[in-house]
Amino acid sequence: MKLRYLFILLIILAVTSVFIGVEDLSPLDLFDLSKQEASTLFASRLPRLISIVIAGLSMSICGLIMQQISRNKFVSPTTAGTMDWARLGILISLLLFTSASPLIKMLVAFVFALAGNFLFMKILERIKFNDTIFIPLVGLMLGNIVSSIATFIAYKYDLIQNVSSWLQGDFSLVVKGRYELLYLSIPLVIIAYVYADKFTLAGMGESFSVNLGLKYKRVVNIGLIIVSLITSLVILTVGMLPFLGLIIPNIVSIYRGDNLKSSLPHTVLLGAVFVLFCDILGRIIIFPYEISIGLMVGIIGSGIFLFMLLRRKAYA
C-alpha cells in the first residue's frame, strides 16, 4: 500500500473520529460552536485523536525496532514482556511515591521496562533456539511472571484498581491536561528514524555489523532505551495496547521488506490507522457505550498473531 493511500485513510478516520461520541457534534457545528461544543471538541475529541495517533505510531515503531535488534519477527513490547515490566514500575512508583507526578511515574516505569528488555536480550544471548517461535514464548512467560508479581503487590496494598486501569488500554479518559506526556514520544520517533539504517545493520547480527564498523552494543542499547521510554509513556497515558508492535511491522514487511528506513514511514501510518480504526469500531459497536481500545486491539491483534504463528515459516 502506498504512503498517500495510508495518509488519505488516516485523514478520513481522523475526521470520523472527531464526530463520534455521546455528545452530538457535526461538521456544520464547527462554523458556530457553542461553549459546550467547543469544550467537547478541544478538551476531549481532539486530545483523544492526537493521543490515538501518537500511541499507534510510536508503539508500532517499538515493535519494528525490537524485531530488528532481536532478529525475530515475533518479538514486540507485548511478547518481550516490556509492557508488564513498565506496569510493575508504575505500581512501584505508587508505593514509593504516593503523590508522584506523571513524570516520576514514567521515569520509574522506564527503568523497569529497560531492565526487563536487557534481561530479555540477555536470555536470547545465553540460550540459542532452533525454532524462532520459542523466543516470544520466553518473553510471554517472563511477562506473565512479572504481571503476577504486580497483581500480588496490587492486592496486598489495595491497588488492584490502579493495575486494572493500565491492563486495558482506554482512550475514553483522555482529556486536555492528561495526555500531553505522550508528546515526548515524537522526538523518540525522530531519533528512531535517524538510527534506522544502524538498526537495520544491527539486525544482521553482531559479528557482521561490527565488521562493517557499527558499534553494535551502543546501537542495541539506544534501541532498547527508545522502546522502553515509549512503552512507559503509552502505558502511563492510555494503558496497554497488546500486539500492536507485533502485527503492524509484520504486515508492512510483507510488501516493504526489512529495510527499516524504507518501512518506517509505512509502519508509522499503518499503526496510527489501525489504532484509530479499532477505537472507532469500539465506540460504535455498543453505542452510546464503548469497548476499550485495549480489548479491540487485543482481539484483532491476537487473531492476526495466531495467523502469523500458523504461517511462521513465512515470517521467521
Curated annotation (Swiss-Prot):
GO molecular function: transmembrane transporter activity
Cell compartments where the protein resides: Cell membrane
InterPro entries: ABC_BtuC-like, ABC_transptr_permease_BtuC
BP terms from Gene Ontology: siderophore-dependent iron import into cell
Keywords attached to this entry: Cell membrane, Ion transport, Iron, Iron transport, Membrane, Transmembrane, Transmembrane helix, Transport
Pfam families in UniProt: FecCD
TM regions (residue ranges): 5-25, 49-69, 94-114, 133-153, 181-201, 224-244, 268-288, 290-310
Entry's Gene Ontology cellular component terms: plasma membrane
Protein role: Part of the ABC transporter complex YclNOPQ involved in uptake of ferric-petrobactin. Petrobactin is a photoreactive 3,4-catecholate siderophore produced by many members of the B.cereus group, including B.anthracis. Probably responsible for the translocation of the substrate across the membrane.
Listed name of the protein: Petrobactin import system permease protein YclN
Organism: Bacillus subtilis (strain 168)
Name of encoding gene: yclN
